[in-house]
Regions:
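Extended hydrophobic leader/signal-anchor segments used for secretion and membrane insertion
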Residues: 1-108
Length: 108
């Protein structure tokens, strides 16, 4: 599924991005292929909302906000808007291979 670039709709499930993206909100996502993920990391912007896989749940997509990017190590630091979110404050930096896509709309 991740061998090409495509767009899709996903529904927010959970409160980690509340209040900006409450549970049930529909998002338009530009999915990033596994081949393009290293090239996509330098194009990310701080505070951009992304879809990632977490180290502890690699089969579950999560929505987070990019807070830091380490291009030398090909890593990103992501956090949920909700302070109770499980994110890089728990996991540390995520490898670029955990990047699934970028939220295109809404782009809060």
């Amino acid at each position: 599924m991740r061998n090409f670039i495509k767009f899709g709709l996903i529904r927010v499930n959970g409160e980690s991005m509340a209040p900006a993206l409450p549970a049930g909100k529909i998002l338009l996502v530009k999915f990033i292929s596994a081949k393009q993920v290293k090239k996509a990391l330098p194009q990310l912007k701080i505070n951009q909302i992304v879809v990632i896989t977490a180290p502890n749940y690699p089969d579950i997509w999560q929505i987070k906000r990019v807070k830091r990017i380490n291009l030398e190590k090909n890593e990103m630091w992501v956090e949920g808007d909700n302070s109770q979110s499980t994110d890089s404050r728990t996991w540390g930096y995520l490898d670029s291979k955990n990047l699934v896509g970028k939220v295109v709309w809404p782009n809060k």
